[in-house]
Amino acid sequence: MAYNYVELGSLITPSKTVRCGDGDYPVLSMTMHNGLVFQDEKFKKVIASKDTSDYKVVYRNQLVISFPIDEGVLAAQRIADAGIVSPAYGIWDIDQSKILPEFLEYALRCDRAIQYYKAKLRGSTARRRTLPTPTLLAFKVPLPCLEEQEKVIDRIHRAQSVKEKRNEQINKLDDLIRARFVEMFGDPVANEKRWGTRPLLSMGTCKNGMNFHYDDYGVEINCLGVGDFKDYSIISNTAMLPTVSLNEMPSPEYLLQDDDIVFVRSNGNKKMVGRSVAVYPGTVPTTFSGFCIRYRRYTDAVITPYLLRVLKADSMRQQMYGRGANIQNLNQQTLSSLDIPVPPKTMQEQFADFVTQVDKSKQAHKYFSKLVA
């Protein structure tokens, strides 16, 4: 259906700044995927500064814009009559006679909007790039009648419900893989089945990723970064990864190969450190960022599908932390201390076949989830 499009500036105006002072309001945090949430629910505690007097009060149905905006961190406040947010956030009043706050939120978080922000950002440092306010307000927003907006919102809600059910099925399939692994091989750290073990680095080598500069140019190449790991176990289409500009093509040691395993080496989020993914770039030249470590096998004692599950086991991740990795870093010395159980290769291959079949089911669920996204 064709809609009229109007500039965002005709729908929102800057709100009057109201500070928290000594008021008692819930602290709200912005998220990429769920908009505004109660901070104590997101982090299981309030992590805001003890002094929130300078925080901004945001009322129900006001628009909150965070940064970097190209990550979609903006939302209509729809969870409390009033809450407080970081003083760095921008707050706008929405003309509700023209547009429903929830409809506006979806319009400003859609792919077309994100691409607009990315194309218009100014500045040289990635996470400090800003979108000039006049440019933001010039963005064209679809504006059907209010009745049609309500219908669109209802369709989005129904699609989200289907997607959530699909994701539940995917999580159950992940649990099935973990259960099958434990059934066949036991816990890789406790090694109650008494498999022979080998140090991880006796079976392969590690390489830290590339550091590059935003003013480099000349060669465009796909690059695996921390933000691309998500909940993946395998990345097989590296052509879909973001590209970076380099002055020259990286040396072969910085190019990923099929069956490589890449770890998150450094991140502010402890849960991300040590996360691993197997990559299969095929013929697509692909490098990896300096916040990652690449592991490359040179022995067939273990196969990648088995080894990846060993490295993803909770007990193995905990061992990484316990042997020298602090909250934000993993290093090659820590990886060298990991002992890997080596069961018979036929068992590893049986497990790999099982994972392949389960992954086919996961891909089917993901495909249908995308259809309703």
Model-inferred region functions:
Residues Y5-C20, M30-L63, R198-H213, G227-I261:
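Sequence-specific dsDNA recognition surfaces
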Residues R60, V64-C110, G225, P252-K312, ...:
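A short beta-sheet element
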Residues I47-S53, A126, A138, P250-S251, ...:
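A structural connector/turn signal
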Residues G83-G90, S124-E147, N211, P285-C292, ...:
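A short glycine-rich beta-alpha junction/loop motif
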Residues R122-T125, A278-Y280, Y321-G324:
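Short amphipathic beta-strand starts and helix->beta connectors
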Residues G21-M30, K120-L121, K193-G196, H213-E220, ...:
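Short coil/turn segments at secondary-structure boundaries
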Residues M1-C20, A138-D154, K165-M210, S337-A373:
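Non-catalytic DNA-recognition/assembly elements of restriction-modification systems
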